[in-house]
């Protein structure tokens, strides 16, 4: 096989591997104590991560004790929001939400997957086989 064909084949396999969307744990925005983690496929431009939502102290929160709970849960996070802090208001309560991202499929759960995606494994194996045949 000529080197141009090898390059095209390798590029196609690598493109397929990189085009895969991440699989992440998600709680559907629910608090961590009621989370039934499900595995979802994140959208284009999203990564696995965690959301940490904490209320900011105020006099209104003293009247609403349930609003003083902090929440930590896994979710898909837009890549451009990774490692950012946002201030959000819900009714009379103001929350600080920190969005942290991690790398790899299912990296935001208690049991993370360390298996190599099949497309990458196939690309490396094919390239090694093609190069050894020359």
UniProtKB/Swiss-Prot annotation:
Which residue numbers fall in the propeptide? 109-134
Q: Per UniProt, what is one GO molecular function of this protein?
A: identical protein binding
Q: Which organism is it from?
A: Rattus norvegicus (Rat)
Give GO cellular component annotations, separated by semicolons: external side of plasma membrane; protein-containing complex; synapse
Q: Which CDD domains does the record match to this protein?
A: TFP_LU_ECD_Ly6G6d
Post-translational modification comment from the UniProt entry: O-glycosylated.
Q: Disulfide connectivity?
A: 24-48, 27-35, 42-76, 82-101, 102-107
This chain is glycosylated at 68
Localization recorded for this chain is:
Cell membrane
- Tell me what topology the record assigns in the membrane: Lipid-anchor; GPI-anchor
Entry keywords, A to Z: Cell membrane, Disulfide bond, Glycoprotein, GPI-anchor, Lipoprotein, Membrane, Signal
User: What PANTHER family would the database entry show?
Assistant: LYMPHOCYTE ANTIGEN 6 COMPLEX LOCUS PROTEIN G6D, LYMPHOCYTE ANTIGEN 6 COMPLEX LOCUS PROTEIN G6F
Name the Pfam families for this protein.
Answer: UPAR_LY6
Q: What is this protein called?
A: Lymphocyte antigen 6 complex locus protein G6d
Residue limits of the UPAR/Ly6 domain?
22-121
Lipidated positions (GPI-anchor amidated asparagine) are 108
For biological process, the GO terms are: acetylcholine receptor signaling pathway
Which segment of the chain is annotated as a signal peptide? 1-19
Q: How does this chain assemble?
A: Homodimer.
């Amino acid at each position: 096989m000529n080197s141009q064909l090898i390059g095209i084949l390798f590029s196609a396999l690598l493109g397929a591997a990189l085009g895969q969307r991440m699989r992440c744990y998600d709680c559907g925005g629910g608090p961590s104590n009621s989370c039934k983690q499900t595995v979802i496929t994140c959208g284009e431009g999203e990564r696995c991560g965690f959301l940490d939502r904490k209320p900011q102290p105020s006099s209104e929160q003293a009247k609403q004790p349930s609003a003083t709970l902090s929440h930590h849960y896994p979710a898909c996070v837009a890549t451009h929001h990774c490692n950012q802090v946002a201030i959000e208001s819900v009714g009379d309560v103001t929350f600080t939400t920190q969005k942290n991202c991690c790398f790899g499929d299912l990296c935001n759960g208690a049991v993370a997957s360390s298996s190599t995606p099949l497309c990458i494994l196939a690309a490396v194996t094919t390239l090694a086989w093609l190069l050894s045949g020359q």
